[in-house]
């Protein structure tokens, strides 16, 4: 490699690192990502838009697609709320709204290729893009092969969706809510936002957060729940469902629907307390360094839940869950 090329690459790398440091400093000072975009301190860069001419602009603020042409949906949103739900219409429809009229480069970009509908926030390299709200509606009888939806700064709600394989959703600073969706596998993750799953039916369910809270009330064969500092609340765990739940400093609250089966429940915390409501006997293995066991326990090794709880300093409290 020529010396001039090497020098140019080093300079480019240093500029990128400097820009990342400036953005990080602003975020630490309490400036939101959306504020950085609006004041021009942050440029939106969506890699695939820069090289793929097949993306089209949502010129009128709304688009519709035949459900026969769409088998998968890939959504990436930056700032603003997202509502993704089933409705009474016969088309897959999307609409975006902003507080002011959008310039061409600020409009949503979409691409439909080989059955995959890809949606992106705007064109590549935009600055001063206003916050935009997105509504995406699919027919009630439409089933996707898979759905992958992510948002950076803004709340996202998914409701009444049917997915053959995996429904994957993620948020950075916004709250995430998934209601009454049916799929084989549901994966939800957030950094500082909360995750709420209500009324969903799936074979396997996985939820992870860093500081956001987790709330789950769903039907599943397997559940994996994990948070660093956020609290976890898992209610009405169905029979035969195996649960693996872990938190570092957050509190775990869990209730089982019944105690007439040999389901496996594992809960692991460091300093967080564990509240457990089992309507009957259980085979409990409680391992702790300095925590206490409180409440009434009916110990049994027969046809009842096998519960393993491990804490460092967190207590285990048996009985009805606190609000």
Segments from the language model and where they lie:
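Generic signature of intrinsically disordered, low-complexity, basic-rich segments
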Residues: 3-4, 20, 184, 243
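Short linear S-[DN]-x-LW-Φ motif typified by the pepsin-like aspartic protease active-site region
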Residues: 26-120, 127-146, 150-170, 176-179, ...
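Amphipathic repeat-derived elements
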Residues: 3, 58, 77-81, 245, ...
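Generic alpha-helix detector with strongest preference for long hydrophobic helices that associate
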Residues: 5, 9, 54-56, 63, ...
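N-terminal Sec-pathway targeting helices
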Residues: 1-17
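Short, surface-exposed interaction patches in beta-rich subdomains
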Residues: 179-181, 186-187, 195-206, 211-323
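Hydrophobic alpha-helical membrane-insertion segments, chiefly the h-region
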Residues: 16-27
């Amino acid at each position: 490699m020529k010396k001039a090329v090497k020098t140019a690459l080093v300079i480019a790398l240093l500029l990128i690192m400097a820009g990342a440091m400036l953005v990080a400093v602003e975020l630490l000072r309490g400036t939101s990502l959306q504020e950085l975009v609006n004041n021009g301190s942050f440029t939106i860069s969506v890699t695939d838009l820069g090289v793929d001419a097949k993306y089209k602009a949502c010129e009128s603020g709304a688009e519709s697609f035949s459900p026969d042409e769409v088998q998968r949906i890939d959504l990436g949103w930056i700032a603003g709320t997202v509502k993704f739900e089933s409705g009474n219409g016969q088309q897959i429809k999307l609409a975006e709204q902003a507080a002011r009229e959008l310039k061409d480069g600020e409009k949503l970009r979409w691409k439909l290729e080989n059955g995959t509908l890809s949606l992106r926030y705007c064109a590549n390299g935009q600055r001063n893009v206003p916050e935009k709200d997105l509504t995406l509606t699919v027919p009630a009888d439409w089933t996707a092969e898979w759905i992958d939806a992510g948002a950076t700064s803004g709340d996202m709600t998914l409701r009444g969706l049917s997915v053959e394989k995996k429904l994957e959703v993620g948020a950075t600073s916004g709250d995430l809510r998934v209601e009454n969706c049916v799929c084989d596998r549901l994966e939800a993750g957030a950094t500082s936002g909360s995750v709420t799953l209500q009324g969903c039916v799936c074979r396997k369910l996985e939820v992870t957060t860093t500081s956001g809270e987790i709330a789950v009330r769903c039907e599943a064969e397997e559940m994996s729940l994990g948070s660093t500092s956020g609290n976890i609340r898992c209610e009405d765990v169905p029979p035969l469902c195996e649960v693996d739940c872990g938190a570092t400093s957050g509190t775990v609250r869990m209730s089982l629907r019944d105690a007439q089966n040999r389901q496996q429940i594992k809960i692991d915390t460091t300093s967080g307390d564990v509240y457990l409501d089992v309507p009957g006997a259980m085979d409990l293995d409680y391992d702790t360094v300095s925590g206490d066991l409180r409440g009434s326990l009916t110990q049994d090794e027969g046809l009842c839940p096998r519960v393993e709880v491990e804490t460092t300093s967190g207590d285990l409290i048996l009985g009805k869950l606190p609000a």
